[in-house]
Amino acid sequence: ISYNTFHTTAICSPTRAALLTGRNHQRVGNGTIAERAVDWDGYTGVIPKSSATMAEVLRHYGYRTAAFGKWHNTPANQTTAMGPFDRWPTGHGFDYFYGFLAGETSQWEPRLVENTTAVEPPHDEKYHLSEDMAVRGIDWLRKHRSFAPDKPFFMYWAPGAAHGPHQVGKEWSGKYKGKFDAGWDAYRERVFAR
């Protein structure tokens, strides 16, 4: 799939809606983030059924589809355990979803959903959502290859680690300890001096 006029916006829900549908974010009801949805044209936070997502189109053509990670394309008042579920990933063409519905979540104790069911992350001090998603994504691909090796697949991968809260394990943060203590300006000067 290749887009010829795609652009990002400064906020995530609109960009995700455009990426998923191949259409302008306001034309698909996502002129702002899902939590700020209002009853104005282009700002409802609802991707209309008349605007199919890539997953819906590809599933129609025989693909198996899965989404992992951050969704953030459902109005907040519709993300409870009671649904409605038609605006969750499985209602937008994904056969499988594992991730979180909101704009951000803890990377160590995330509020996770598998398809339409809330699930608890493992209670393990070494747990991190990015690693969990990678393991589950690889597992999904292995199952797909085992059960339907000739069937095409589409995996939507949307990690949440770039969003707050910024939580990284010590094995990663330790590599940068002391490198930025002089401040942004000093670092910038060193970079531009190279």
Q: Predicted segments — roles?
A:
Residues 1-194:
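Formylglycine-dependent sulfatase
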